[in-house]
């Protein structure tokens, strides 16, 4: 490790949200960098440590923002952006962490972060038994996104060889991972995306059997064409986006989620499984639709279940197997993890906006390399 020499003049910038409810996000306006004043030479209190941020990802921050909880409301106020990050300990007065240790956890997007004693318990040492050179994997397939995709597919989807899965909103990191895992289990995999470029990427690079561009083709037309014999698993990865309420995305994804769900119901086979991340949009279950919704559920003996990573039967239950199997698949190069990296703290706001508006970018896992 290169030792960082810090003094009172050491630059320390933090990414701050000013206002996320005033139209499309623009780097430098709603999301900006601010200077953080601190004395880096001051001794650390007991159990405190100082870390230098290396990598941050905004993808899961979007899902936090889409939550209907009070915490998500607080995220919209003027405050530092906090997200899953990898950092290196550069100074420690905590017995659990030594100088040079790599740690992972939810941190502010800030060059240098003083971790108070109470917050230190939320950090974890970055364990890398397979000695992967690319530690960014622990923010994607080997981290929370991978665990979310893995636990939901196996806990609810219960994939069986020969079945068919449809992933609505398959172009983001979760959708890509679910599709690749389903393919490894011998399923026929179809996905919906927002551009021809992303559809081509899913098919040619990730091995999807097919899909459709929902900007050009309605799911009511696409599903009979793609899956005339029906689908066994429907993975709703669109409806949660209706909670974003950013730059018109709420209305856009609300309508898309409704149309996908209604079309999927008509194509579900008996004993099919339907899963939703977080919360579905209100318009998805309006009164005119709910009768059909319930009728098909009973008629086709469907299982419908929402999920969140904190549920006991998800992250906690599947954590060990997720890490074992995912590491093996990564070592065997059976999974592709497309990553779009933006380098430098000065580009932190740009990377944040890119995570929300990435229609031109097929590599939808956006990573900020701080140093």
Curated annotation (Swiss-Prot):
Residues at which NADP(+) binds: 172-175, 198, 214, 237, 277-283, 307-309
Single annotated GO MF: oxidoreductase activity, acting on the CH-CH group of donors, NAD or NADP as acceptor
Keyword Oxidoreductase: yes
Assigned keywords, A-Z: NADP, Oxidoreductase
Known pathway: Secondary metabolite biosynthesis
Superkingdom, natural source: Eukaryota
InterPro entries linked: ADH-like_C (IPR013149), ADH_N_2 (IPR041694), GroES-like_sf (IPR011032), MDR_fam (IPR045010), NAD(P)-bd_dom_sf (IPR036291)
EC number(s) from the headed UniProt entry: 1.-.-.-
Presence of the UniProt keyword Glycosyltransferase in the record: no
Record PANTHER family: PROSTAGLANDIN REDUCTASE, PROSTAGLANDIN REDUCTASE 1
UniProt record similarity statement: Belongs to the NADP-dependent oxidoreductase L4BD family.
Function noted in UniProt: NADP-dependent oxidoreductase; part of the lna gene cluster that mediates the biosynthesis of diastereomeric piperazines. Lna and lnb clusters encode sets of enzymes that produce overlapping sets of previously undescribed metabolites such as piperazinomycin-like metabolites or morpholine. The lna and lnb biosynthetic pathways appear to be part of a signaling network that controls the formation of sclerotia, a resilient overwintering structure. One primary function of the non-canonical nonribosomal peptide synthetases lnaA and lnbA consists in the reduction of L-tyrosine.
Protein's UniProt name: NADP-dependent oxidoreductase lnaE
């Amino acid at each position: 490790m290169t030792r960082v020499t810090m003094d009172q003049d050491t630059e320390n910038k933090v990414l701050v949200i000013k206002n996320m409810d005033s139209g499309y996000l623009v780097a430098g306006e709603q999301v900006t960098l601010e200077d953080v004043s601190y004395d880096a030479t001051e001794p650390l209190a007991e159990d405190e440590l100082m870390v230098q941020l290396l990598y941050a990802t905004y993808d899961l921050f979007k899902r936090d923002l889409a939550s209907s909880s009070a915490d998500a409301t607080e995220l919209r106020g003027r405050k530092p952006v906090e997200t899953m990050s990898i950092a290196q300990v550069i100074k420690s007065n905590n017995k659990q962490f030594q100088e040079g240790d790599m740690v992972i956890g939810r941190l502010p997007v800030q060059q240098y972060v003083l971790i108070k004693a109470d917050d230190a318990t939320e950090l974890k040492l970055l364990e890398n038994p397979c000695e992967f050179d690319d530690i960014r994997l622990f923010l994607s397939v080997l981290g929370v996104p991978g665990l979310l995709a893995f636990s939901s597919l196996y806990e609810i989807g219960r994939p069986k060889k020969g079945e068919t899965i449809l992933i609505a909103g398959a172009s983001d990191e979760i959708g890509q991972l679910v599709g690749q895992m389903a393919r490894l289990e011998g399923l026929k995999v179809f996905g919906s995306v927002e551009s021809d470029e992303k559809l081509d990427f899913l098919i040619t690079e990730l091995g999807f059997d097919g899909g459709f561009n929902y900007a050009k083709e309605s799911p009511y037309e696409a599903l009979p064409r793609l899956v005339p014999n029906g689908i066994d698993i429907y993975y709703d990865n669109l409806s949660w986006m209706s909670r974003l309420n950013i730059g018109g995305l709420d209305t856009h994804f609300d309508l898309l989620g409704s149309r996908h769900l209604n079309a999927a119901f008509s194509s579900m086979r008996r004993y099919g499984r339907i899963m939703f991340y977080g919360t579905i949009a209100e318009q998805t279950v309006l009164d005119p639709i709910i009768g059909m919704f319930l009728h098909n559920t009973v008629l086709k003996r469907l299982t419908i279940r929402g999920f969140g990573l904190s549920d006991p039967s998800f992250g906690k239950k599947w954590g060990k197997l997720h890490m074992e199997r995912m590491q093996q698949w990564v070592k065997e190069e059976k999974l592709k993890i497309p990553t779009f990296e933006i380098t430098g703290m000065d580009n932190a706001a740009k990377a944040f906006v890119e995570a929300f508006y990435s229609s031109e970018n097929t590599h939808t896992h956006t990573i900020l390399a701080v140093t």
